[in-house]
Amino acid sequence: RRALKPQGLLLFSTFGPETLWELRSAFAHADAAPHVSPFVDIAGIGDALVNAGFFQPVVDREEEVTHYPNLPALMHELRALGATNALRSRRTTLTGRSRFAAASTAYETHRAAAGLPATWEIVSAMAWAPEPGAPIREGGADLVAVPVSKIPIRRRG
């Protein structure tokens, strides 16, 4: 809210929770550690915008599916995009050949004629910035922000 002028338009896109669900599922068969970062769902994004005081939010989603010849090709593209696992709870050691082979075998169950699918859920949102001093909402209630300089000092005396 500090960077956007009052009644300015906020536009953004991000990934949704269905992004790379096939990869997440495949690695879940091979390893208990998470391998795909989680993303906020469309309702959570809308709620966050409203709670931050933005008005008239519009949130939409679409899915795009790309296909790869094999799991290493997908992993190579993810690394090239910089989309590696950023989770703190991720495994810090190498995945290892046996785990990677188990994930690859599990991923093969999703194979289509075009190759291994990778789903990308794209969530797009827009909302209008609130007026200066508009309340921030949390848990359905307005939070009041009062600058310290505006708090009167009562002196005993």
Task: List each language-model region with its residue ranges.
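Conserved catalytic/acceptor-binding region of the Class I
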Residues: 5-71, 81-94
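C-terminal lobe and adjacent flexible extensions of AdoMet/dcAdoMet transferase-like proteins
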Residues: 72-157
